[in-house]
């Protein structure tokens, strides 16, 4: 929703994401915009495509992303053993784009989201060339991308960055810590969450760093894409409805009760789409 909203104001936005298997058809329809001979263990390409009215950049690296399981976990439910390389590659590619790797377009600002993109400012910092500022966005500070310090070399990170003011985190590497320490600005999903992150109870070990940087920390309340979450046009619903035509809402409730074996009731019915975790 954020890229679409920015684009609507005239900002030229490009969204970089890994070319996961579910995006294979979309990638096949695109144009190669940039290539890497060796991106953390194999060749890779950045493919330019358009989707939902947005300019997308797909990082096509089959050795890192073309596999069974889900985005973060293997079929056994455990983290992929090379998740550090998989998401270092995403950060490295973003940094190269920021250094004019595409040739015909260079971002004015890079917005990196969560630990998976946390190394973007680290790669820009160690390169040394003029680069766009980085805004680091925290969606959930509990996920920090922590890996053994021995991974510095495989991750193509200079040892000079391994300091308390850089990527070092209790003797290990933290991708999220790197993003928070080295970015120019930090945002998160609400003003209240931004305030919570400054406390030991909710800062998950990074509250001290965030207190040091609180003048650069902004809480921006999460919104939704009103085109996607519109019950009047949502094709995934049993029946559509609107604020003035509510009949379809009752049909959706009946379907939900039937699907989950709920006892029919006239009382309120609340539904939550969420991870099952103590945080929620």
Please tell me what each predicted stretch does.
Residues 1-280:
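Catalytic cores of nucleotide-sugar-dependent glycosyltransferases that transfer UDP/GDP/TDP-activated
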């Amino acid at each position: 929703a954020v890229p679409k909203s920015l684009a609507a104001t005239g900002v030229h936005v490009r969204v970089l994401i890994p070319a996961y298997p579910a995006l294979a058809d979309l990638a096949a329809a695109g144009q190669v915009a940039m290539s890497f001979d060796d991106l953390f263990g194999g060749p890779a390409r950045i493919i330019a495509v358009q989707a939902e009215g947005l300019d997308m950049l797909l990082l096509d690296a089959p050795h890192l992303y073309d596999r069974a399981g889900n985005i973060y976990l293997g079929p056994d439910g455990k983290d992929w053993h090379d998740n550090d390389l998989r998401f270092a590659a995403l950060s490295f590619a973003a940094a190269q784009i920021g250094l004019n790797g595409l040739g015909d377009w260079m971002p004015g600002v890079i917005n990196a989201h969560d630990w998976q993109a946390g190394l973007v400012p680290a790669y820009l910092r160690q390169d040394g060339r003029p680069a766009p500022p980085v805004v680091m966005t925290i969606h959930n500070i509990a996920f920090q991308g922590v890996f053994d310090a021995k991974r510095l070399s495989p991750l193509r990170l200079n040892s000079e960055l391994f300091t308390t003011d850089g990527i070092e985190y209790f003797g290990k590497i933290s991708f999220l810590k790197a993003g928070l320490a080295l970015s120019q600005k930090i945002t998160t999903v609400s003003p209240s969450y931004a305030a919570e992150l400054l406390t030991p109870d909710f800062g998950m070990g990074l509250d001290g760093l965030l207190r040091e940087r609180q003048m650069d920390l902004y809480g921006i309340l999460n919104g939704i894409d009103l085109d996607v979450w519109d019950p009047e046009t949502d094709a995934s619903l049993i029946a559509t409805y609107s604020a003035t035509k509510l009949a379809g809402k009752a049909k959706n409730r009946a379907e939900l009760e039937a699907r989950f074996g709920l006892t029919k009731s006239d009382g309120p019915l609340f539904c939550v789409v969420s991870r099952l975790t103590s945080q929620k």
